[in-house]
Amino acid sequence: MSWQAYVDDHLLCGIEGNHLTHAAIIGQDGSVWLQSTDFPQFKPEEITAIMNDFNEPGSLAPTGLYLGGTKYMVIQGEPGAVIRGKKGPGGVTVKKTGAALIIGIYDEPMTPGQCNMVVERLGDYLIDQGY
């Protein structure tokens, strides 16, 4: 299966009629494996900060999670595995696998729980596949 198929079939799929706004699979070094059209242009230091939070959980809480210049308030996640952020009616979920970061960005009417389910399900699958 191609990386494009992972994004199209697993991240941008419909959940109860709702879809992620943007999705990406990127290497932990910040290299883009694949991203949806119009995924926010992120900066290398934003990915570095996200990786630092996986290694030192809670490090993003004081400053927020930035992705593509957008600031998200960090909310409950799973230390070392999942970071979740909220901004207004939308938010972001970042799932860490052995080699990659799975990122899903959503807006209403999608719910945080739906975003978490889509992103984390693909992340768990990729972990099982050795990624």
Swiss-Prot record:
Subunit details: Occurs in many kinds of cells as a complex with monomeric actin in a 1:1 ratio.
Task of the protein: Binds to actin and affects the structure of the cytoskeleton. At high concentrations, profilin prevents the polymerization of actin, whereas it enhances it at low concentrations. By binding to PIP2, it inhibits the formation of IP3 and DG.
Taxonomic source organism: Glycine max
Tagged with keyword Ribosomal protein: no
Pfam families: Profilin
CDD domains, per the entry: PROF
The protein's name: Profilin-2
Entry GO MF terms: actin monomer binding
Chief site of localization: cytoplasm
Designated gene of the protein: PRO2
Family: Belongs to the profilin family.
Domain of life: Eukaryota
Transmembrane segments annotated in the record for this chain: none
InterPro entries for the chain: PFN, PFN_euk, PFN_sf, Profilin_CS
Keywords: Actin-binding, Allergen, Cytoplasm, Cytoskeleton
GO terms for cellular component: cell cortex; cytoskeleton
Record localization: Cytoplasm, Cytoskeleton
SMART domains in UniProt: PROF (SM00392)
